[in-house]
Amino acid sequence: MIEALDEAIASWRTGRAEAADYDALVHRARRRFASLVAVPPDRVAVGNQVSTFTGLVAAALPDGARVLAAEEDFTSVLFPFLAHADRGVRVQTVPLDRLVESIRPGVSLVALSAVQSADGRLVPGGLDALASAAAAHGCLTYVDATQAVGWLPFDAGRFDFVSCAAYKWLVSPRGTAFGVVRPERLELLRPLFPGWYAGEDPWTSIYGAPLRLAKDARRLDISPAWLAWAGTVPALDLLEEVGIAAIHRHDLGLANKLRERLGLPRGDSAIVTVSADGGLERFRGGDIRASVRAGAVRLSFHLHNTESDVDAVARALGV
């Protein structure tokens, strides 16, 4: 990825960059992501962040709609819905372990992160149970898959709307993201940011009326930050080459080795959280990158990590 970015920046700096080359990269990234989440490419829109896609879904809800969400979920999942309070959109939050059982008649949409950003928790009972409960009650589903896609097998076709920022587990530059829409739900979403790149043929949609948007999810595309996409493509290529099943085994295996060292029960997440006592200083000597989220230290294991990293964390924690 770094080499691809360096090459793209060099081409840009020297004036050798061609717009059509970047366009090909975006199309390739769309296809790669579609493959990773098991949907056709025509269901995938490209963008730059999760909250943009959440905002499209929030704007599509009717006045007075009721949204069900998990307590303390990432705000890019919550804020866009809360911003519609002036037209009666209500957001009810419940503990994650009660989310599925709280889906009932009257809920317009359930919104959640597939994996919780703060502590790595997955919804109890699994996403299949959530999708089934929502379908049984005629409830739409919106899933932010940012903390899932790249290590956790994920079928985006189970949900009405999905978003995913690529800079986390897709190991891509910040500023690239994807949205997935079921074909039968596409008409619910008004393109709020339509520009030339959302056109049926972007290169003939640069000037003038009438409106001529793509017929598929590309109608929701946001004009891409080309250099960021130059780094996203090789990252997605690598993930597809290694395979999500193998990455899942690797990442979860390392996370559970750390849990075992810490005397914690085995888990189902590649994210491990430990007490924030002592802050991050105890990790700096071991060249360990960690974050403090929601009062705990968050540690994540991915394809570049090895058992030596587990040992380094254990030493830093004194176990």
Label each region the model flagged.
Residues 1-319:
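Pyridoxal 5′-phosphate
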